[in-house]
């Protein structure tokens, strides 16, 4: 087993590192200042001019569609290469936050389109998506159903050759974007088993009957909205995949997001550990350097151990994705738990080591702590993932070998 990076991957990682240092790090103060005023003054985390400039630079660098097939307008370098870039960018608050700056296209929804989209859907959406001309949002969560998808109540009923969709969704992102389409999950057969109950539909933002509701502020500067579906009528061309077959592709889509989240976590954890090292060597208490305090030494040692364990799991899971393993639900669930809980602990130690400074917005550590708290809930709560992992292992009736590459 070869753990070394290829020459191309090493170069990609270095280019991403320089981009992060030169373009993203200098904008951190702007992000932290605007984040305080998002909900009162209607700010985005980055000024539009800065966001447009970063988009132009990353497009010229070949960072758009890193993992996307070249036939669809991407770079064709795979999930592992994308992971290396996301990890480097996430050492900055700008790249760490999903609402700071992310590389187009949004990988999970793209994977869903690639896996299940018809030729017509790919022609209409995928290429524009890869070029950054259009964005997408997943529309699954409802007021009464989050991690437990079996509780969804939004329905799509066949009527006069069309699908009529009714229901409401909540905590939906990106609704402030003009050029947007949704992947909406709806119940098409209430009596069917969970895995055959749901169908995915592609809905353009301007589809009649689709209404964007109130904005819902949540911690970590993560804007979300309610969305209402009132007799939304679409044809069969809007069905993504097969009728009644959305459950497994949706779980695989979540798996891609969980790999991506883990890369955000490992990148930022590395940044925080370096901040802890710098502060420990700089600061003294009662005449003794923090670096000589055993508690501080333990914090830094434990953080390093935990980071490298998660990073190895992350790289292995991304590699398996590139090898064609489609069902990575178990790996992705385990990875998301490990990564988000690791960063939670590292951020807490970093705050504690920095004392009052750690609590200030100036350092940005408290922002990380708020963001990672969100990630232990979204894309499947940690408790649900633990339950799923245990259920899989306990009911399969086979020898324990969940992560062995076939």
Curated annotation (Swiss-Prot):
Pfam families: Acyl-CoA_dh_1, Acyl-CoA_dh_M, Acyl-CoA_dh_N
Cofactors named for this entry: FAD
GO terms of molecular function: (R)-benzylsuccinyl-CoA dehydrogenase activity; acyl-CoA dehydrogenase activity; flavin adenine dinucleotide binding
Gene Ontology CC entries for this record: cytoplasm
Pathway the protein acts in: Xenobiotic degradation; toluene degradation
UniProt xrefs under InterPro entries: Acyl-CoA_dehydrogenase (IPR050741), Acyl-CoA_Oxase/DH_mid-dom (IPR006091), Acyl-CoA_Oxase/DH_mid-dom_sf (IPR046373), AcylCo_DH-like_C (IPR036250), AcylCo_DH/oxidase_C (IPR009075), AcylCoA_DH/ox_N (IPR013786), AcylCoA_DH/ox_N_sf (IPR037069), AcylCoA_DH/oxidase_NM_dom_sf (IPR009100)
Expression induction: Induced by toluene.
Catalytic EC class: oxidoreductase
Documented EC number(s): 1.3.8.3
Catalytic activity reported: (R)-2-benzylsuccinyl-CoA + oxidized [electron-transfer flavoprotein] + H(+) = (E)-2-benzylidenesuccinyl-CoA + reduced [electron-transfer flavoprotein]
Activity sensitivity to pH: Optimum pH is 8.0.
Regulation of protein activity: Inhibited by (S)-benzylsuccinyl-CoA.
The keyword S-adenosyl-L-methionine appears for this protein: no
Protein origin, superkingdom: Bacteria
GO process annotations (BP): fatty acid beta-oxidation using acyl-CoA dehydrogenase; toluene catabolic process
Keyword terms of this UniProt record: Aromatic hydrocarbons catabolism, FAD, Flavoprotein, Oxidoreductase
Thermal dependence, as annotated: Optimum temperature is 50 degrees Celsius.
Stored PANTHER family: MEDIUM-CHAIN SPECIFIC ACYL-COA DEHYDROGENASE, MITOCHONDRIAL (PTHR48083:SF2), MEDIUM-CHAIN SPECIFIC ACYL-COA DEHYDROGENASE, MITOCHONDRIAL-RELATED (PTHR48083)
Record family assignment: Belongs to the acyl-CoA dehydrogenase family.
Quaternary organization: Homotetramer.
Function in brief: Catalyzes the oxidation of benzylsuccinyl-CoA to benzylidenesuccinyl-CoA.
Protein name in the entry: (R)-benzylsuccinyl-CoA dehydrogenase
Organism whose genome encodes this protein: Thauera aromatica
Taxonomic classification: Bacteria, Pseudomonadati, Pseudomonadota, Betaproteobacteria, Rhodocyclales
